Amino acid sequence: MKTKNRVWYILFIVVGSVLVISNSCKKDNPTQSVIKLSAVTDVDGNIYGKVIIGTQIWLTENLKTTKYRNGDLIGTTTPAELNIYDEVTPKYQWAYDGDEDKVATYGRLYTWYVITDTRNICPTGWHVPSDAEWLTLENYLGGYAIAGGKLKEIGTTHWVTPNYMATNETGFTALPNGWRHIEDIFVNFAKFGGWWSSTEYTATDAFCNYVSYKSDLITEEIDSKKCGIAVRCLKDQ
């Protein structure tokens, strides 16, 4: 039976971080405390928020870095639409459609070979989540059929209409970053948001998760490791 629960947004002042206190109500299980914590910085100097969801701590934005954790540059293609189908293990990052102005809001897109490179791309103390860790998030939020709505940013500032059942009650703030096919095109900007997992399916494919403007699902899919897909980092435990 579904019950109404109160969720507390606990935002407090700590050294170097200023946060605000309020509370509101939400429906459906599971309920949770949304605690916005002090910021995280990547090797490029990009700053990210972080949020507790169940037993996990997630960044609240997609990764934007152009470097591995050790400072090595991650390659890209010129032009952004270059066909990489025949490359064996391409390691690239892109702004969507080659438009650097989109990076601040939507982050970058990476091939799977980048996100599993031993040099790491998440900030120190963070990692690209496995398929099992995505499933932990999904289950905590009540299952795949409703979890997507709880992750998506509210409204149509970034999402196309109707952005069905978006509540962002988790503070995850999923945005429709689209993705890059292995041939030469960028697709589904403003309609779908997706993120890699570190778990491979076969030698050529890996698991990823998507949310859509037209449903409140979170959908596990299998894509080519050569695709450009966003990354949302998870804190090490």
Regions found by a protein language model. Give the residues of each.
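Bacterial N-terminal signal peptides that target proteins for export
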Residues: 2-11
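Conserved positions within compact, well-structured domain cores
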Residues: 27-237
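Beta-rich interaction/scaffold domains
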Residues: 2, 26-27
